[in-house]
Structure formats: structure tokens, C-alpha cells
Amino acid sequence: MAEKLDSKLEAQFAKAPIWPTLDAPLPASQMPDHIAIIMDGNGRWAAQQGMVRINGHQAGVDSVRNVTRYCGQVHVTALTLYAFSTENWKRPQAEVRFLFRLLKKYLVNERAELIANNVRLSAVGNLTGLPADVQAELQRTRDLTARNSGLNLCLALNYGAQDEILSASRGVLEHVASGKLSPAEIDEPAIEKELFTAGMPPLDLLIRTAGER
């Protein structure tokens, strides 16, 4: 059964390649510096193809590999992938466990390619809430790619916008309480320094793979 599903998956990709051939790449001045992708709709895509949801998630991993290679080739500075949100914990536990197994497998299997292609892996979100084995592989990959100077591939894991706002607010308040920052000095840069994405370039392009708005 699994082999039939894998064959069907390969056939779908063969019919619809992820990236068209670019006759003339965009000039560097027009290339987005920071691209973010909300990775949703994988399960629905699989259902539309007559496959089970987990095959949709596997297809998503294949897409990540292609997108990462592409962004590296056209010299995008940062690629953020919103891979697992705080809302995703509400999914069936069997599906959640599969997603983390898939993430762990990705971190292990893609490590050599990330290193070879000068890609630096980073991560944002409440990472301590992830399974211990996933945290370990994530940290190992981050450590091994830390000195790479090419594409910054940032995985948003256990991420929620409200969590980020709360975390940033607490960080600013702690600086005020310790005397490192006065209330009058609270401005946009001070808040940006406390965001999960501190140090990353401003977002230029946001893509939601499910097509929702």
C-alpha cells in the first residue's frame, strides 16, 4: 500500500514540477531578501489526490528541499518556514507524532546537504516545548551549520504570533525592571531586539501554500 502511495506521489510531482524554468533570473536588486512560507494545506492536498494525510506531509518535506535549494541558488538571504504552530498541537496525536518523526528525519537526512551548500539552520518559537529527541537533532544541526554564511534557513517550530508578542513584551519589561532600559527608551528597535526573529532581515514576501488569506 505504501509503495503504491509513493508511486502516486512521484507521478503527481512529475506532472506538476514545483519550480518552472527561469529563462532570465530576477536581477539581484529585485530578488526578495527574506521569504517566509506558511506550510499548510498538505493534508488537504493529499486528500484531493486520493492519498492519506501523512503523504501530504511527506510531499511538504520534498518541497522544502526544493525551495531551499532554489533560494540558495538565487542568493536569497533568509528563508523562514512556518512548519509547526502552537495551534498544530490540536491535531490528532498520531498525526502530531508523525510530524515530529518527519522533522527529526529531515534534520538528520538533510544535514550533510545543508553543510555542503553553505546553508545555516536556525529556529524560532518555543523550542523547549518540542520533544527532547527533536530538540537534540535540531541543536546538533544548528551547531554544525552555525559558521555557514549562505542562506539562513529558519524553522518556526511551536511558534505562535501571540507567544512572540508576549515573549518580546516580557523581555522589554525585564530590561526596564533591571534598569538597563528606561520607559522612555522603549521604541521599535528595542522591541525588535526581543522578537524571535531578532537579527533577521525584514520580511519581503510571505507565501501561504494552502492559498488561504
Locate predicted features.
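Flexible, compositionally biased loop and terminal segments
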Residues: 1-213
